[in-house]
């Protein structure tokens, strides 16, 4: 596969000023993280898998090349914050549904989705650069990795809340078939709102 804008990613890595690498569930997140970890060691967030053997396999795969994977918990968030302060590269999926109390309801495809605000918080606290990375196919199913810089609105309190979901929408819309719609993005509905997946 080809990599679009790899020069941008290498340039930001080489500055050694910390870097927030944002993925989402387009094609294979694990394949993408494997590629990222081949470019530079990272500290990444992951959601623990109930099957302990599969969990161990996935975690070990994500910890190659001196990378570290930490669970999506308060403790894990502290670790990636410290990694950023130490000018390391962090990576996680920004469309991952957070635990209750660790996110907010933000519009995603014009529907309230329980969303992480971790990207916005880390960016504002550290002023580290933020980039999106995602896998995409073309009409011949040839895969590419796309890398895009996040807007400076990520550092603006009046704009950053809606930014991540809006940007992810735009990238999904480039080729909607690539998004993992089976990943239940709206599974944590607000009180009184019907679960959209119950009839699926």
Predicted segments with their positions:
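A short, well-structured juxtamembrane/interface segment
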Residues: 1-19, 27
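Non-catalytic C-terminal accessory region of glycerolipid acyltransferases
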Residues: 10-16, 38-39, 43, 75-200
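Catalytic core of membrane glycerolipid acyltransferases/transacylases, capturing the structured
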Residues: 17-74, 100-107, 111
